[in-house]
Design a protein with these regions (language model features):
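Conserved class I S-adenosyl-L-methionine
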Residues: 1-43, 143-172
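Class I SAM-dependent methyltransferase "Motif I" SAM/SAH-binding loop
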Residues: 53-55
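Class I SAM-dependent methyltransferase SAM/SAH-binding core
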Residues: 57-102
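A conserved beta-strand element that flanks and buttresses the S-adenosyl-L-methionine
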Residues: 115
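A short, conserved alpha-helix within the catalytic core of class I
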Residues: 123-133
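Short alpha-helix
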Residues: 185-204
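A C-terminal cap/extension of S-adenosyl-L-methionine-dependent methyltransferases
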Residues: 198, 208-255
């Protein structure tokens, strides 16, 4: 498998957008607010929290505003540019590291709570290894926000905009190579509740699994900020391009 799906090193504009949310120049993401609602149900003072796929630190801003201003927080992201933005936003008030979800740079049970928002769907299938790493580094709770579906779908969203912004001549007719592989793409995978329950049981059958719908958000439209395929609300449903998004939280508790 190629690394053509790792688009974020080229997506500096997206990192800059997250940075503006982290420092308060833009509103909090609805997913950040939803995370806080789930997290607040079991968070206690002095718990250590790891944020996997932390971006530019925008989730930390929401957690500080909604839960604990002095939270013991560590953020990790595979994209160095995003990590540097997060360090700029928060200085020494939080720890941000570069690291990969497939091999997190922490010992077993290093954190009370591990959170992972909006990342699993963008990883190559199957998500077993990433989820097992989240479980490994947590001593108590894991929160994963991702898209669910009635069937399992492996989706490749073919991209060209990053190359176009760098002045490279990418024509739509040349987006897919002779072997059927997109030149640049990101995954947008959707899995069933049963699939997640089964892989968690394979990792550790003693883990308690709870599915929490993420449907308590205000109406919004991100297309002005992030383009015509950005997430928006239509008739009470979140939509991205042609995809209907059933966001839920996978909440795992270690027994």
């Amino acid at each position: 498998m190629t690394d053509n799906w790792r688009i974020w090193n080229k997506a500096k504009d997206y990192g800059d957008l997250l940075y503006k949310r982290a420092i308060g120049d833009l509103d909090e993401m609805e997913s950040s607010k939803a995370l806080c609602r789930v997290l607040s149900s079991f968070y206690e003072k002095r718990m250590k929290v790891l944020d996997v796929g932390c971006g530019a630190g925008h989730y930390l801003r929401s957690i500080r505003l909604g839960i604990d201003e002095d939270i013991d927080y560590t953020g990790v992201d595979a994209t160095e540019y995003y990590v540097n933005l997060a360090r700029t936003a928060f200085g020494d008030a939080a720890r941000f590291l570069r690291g990969d979800i497939y091999n997190l740079p922490f010992e077993d049970n290093s954190f009370d709570i591990v959170i992972c928002n909006n990342l699993i769907l963008h990883l190559p299938p199957p998500p077993i290894k990433p989820v097992s790493e989240l479980v490994r580094t947590s001593s108590k709770y894991i929160i994963v926000r991702t898209v669910f579906a009635e069937r399992n779908y492996i989706i490749k969203e073919v991209r060209s905009s990053y190359e176009e912004k760098q002045g490279l001549p990418i024509r739509d007719g040349n987006l897919i190579d002779s072997k059927g592989e997109p030149l640049v793409y990101n995954y947008f995978n959707m899995y069933t509740e049963k699939y997640f329950r089964d892989i968690v049981a394979d990792i550790n059958e003693k883990i308690d699994v709870k599915i929490v719908p993420d449907d308590s958000w205000s109406s919004f439209d991100n297309t002005a900020l992030a383009g015509k395929t950005a997430t928006k609300v239509i008739s009470g449903k979140q939509v991205s391009g042609n995809l209907l998004l059933d966001w839920r939280f996978l909440v795992l508790s270690q027994k």
